[in-house]
Regions:
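Non-catalytic interface/linker regions that flank or bridge core catalytic/transmembrane domains
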Residues: 1-36
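Divalent metal-dependent catalytic cores for phosphoryl transfer on phosphate-bearing substrates
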Residues: 38-46, 52, 59, 63-145
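All-alpha helical catalytic cores of prenyl diphosphate-utilizing isoprenoid enzymes
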Residues: 23-30, 43-55
Length: 145
């Protein structure tokens, strides 16, 4: 299994250098950001899915949209890596009963459930959380919503 946490931190530390970036990363490390899913049913609905999704968005943005000498690498890293920070501490693992087709027995299986502690709009919540630690440019805030 890839070490998505190390990949994320490497990209983040190389690109995100503005005041407060270190405090934001420390906060992320105190949450489940690096182990949480990105969703309950769709993309990244697995352990570490959130950090994996964030890295995938970063790689896609850099490959398809970044122009060296024109674009700001920090802005791309901030927008891609942090667009879903609102999903940190957003899911919890619960269990439900599912019938095993082979045995006919009911079994408890884990699944991800939303446990929203801060009911705020999805993109707006990411901006709100980021801004606790570091300032965003207007275009970064808009791109994250």
């Amino acid at each position: 299994m890839e070490d998505y946490r190390a990949q994320f931190i490497d990209i983040y530390n190389k690109n995100v250098t503005r005041p407060g970036a270190d405090r934001l990363l420390k906060w992320l490390e105190g949450t489940d950001f690096f182990t949480a899913p990105a969703s309950t049913k769709f993309h990244g609905a697995c352990e570490c899915g959130l950090v994996m999704h964030s890295i995938n968005v970063y790689n896609a943005m850099m490959q398809h949209f970044f122009t060296e000498g024109e674009d700001n690498p920090e802005t791309f890293a901030v927008c891609a890596l942090l667009h879903d920070v609102c999903k940190a501490n957003f899911y919890k693992v619960s269990t439900r009963n599912v019938k095993n087709d082979a045995t006919g027995q009911w079994e408890k299986v884990p699944f991800y459930q939303v446990a929203d502690q801060l009911p705020y709009g999805h993109g707006e919540k990411s901006v709100y959380l980021i801004e606790h630690f570091m300032r965003l440019k207007t275009d970064e805030a808009i791109a994250s919503t």
